[in-house]
């Protein structure tokens, strides 16, 4: 495969941008315009995988000679696998989510799609990460939400910040999966496209 230098992150997420920056690559950001609501999916894996693929495909269709990276994440409780946990958007919803998930285990299904249409390269997959919340008091929840305001975060926490203090344990092979962009897997596929890392 010839050397491909144009990389596009198909995302408007500041967290995914910060993760991508860790790789030290030159890339651009283009926000895809897709419908992110469930389309009959009954499992978080199916929804996250479809959204990651569609985000990358919408941008790839416009830039077929570029490597396009799409990612999406869906959270769900282990005991309620068909009930997706979205972004809270308000302080009240964030506090309610944390109260409901206190002492529970959440799984994060993170979809990743890497596409280079000109060469026919396309890999779309799911990575998982689990967190077990401590039993949280109402005062802890209120202090956390007031301090960090995780209103755009599925599950109502930022693990890269103070949110780490809410957990009893974490389980997964790549913590960046929990943050929304599995870098270990992404690097594997970028190397297949002759992107030098490191």
Curated annotation (Swiss-Prot):
Its EC number is 3.6.1.9. Its cofactor is a divalent metal cation. GO terms for cellular component: cytoplasm. It comes from the Bacteria. GO terms for biological process: nucleotide metabolic process. One of its GO terms (molecular function) is nucleoside triphosphate diphosphatase activity. Keywords: Cytoplasm, Hydrolase, Nucleotide metabolism. It catalyses: a ribonucleoside 5'-triphosphate + H2O = a ribonucleoside 5'-phosphate + diphosphate + H(+); a 2'-deoxyribonucleoside 5'-triphosphate + H2O = a 2'-deoxyribonucleoside 5'-phosphate + diphosphate + H(+). Gene3D superfamilies: 3.90.950.10. InterPro entries: ITPase-like_fam, Maf-like. It holds the Pfam family Maf. It is found in: Cytoplasm. The active site is at 72 (proton acceptor). Belongs to the Maf family. Nucleoside triphosphate pyrophosphatase. May have a dual role in cell division arrest and in preventing the incorporation of modified nucleotides into cellular nucleic acids. PANTHER family: 7-METHYL-GTP PYROPHOSPHATASE, BIFUNCTIONAL DTTP/UTP PYROPHOSPHATASE/METHYLTRANSFERASE PROTEIN-RELATED. This is Nucleoside triphosphate pyrophosphatase.
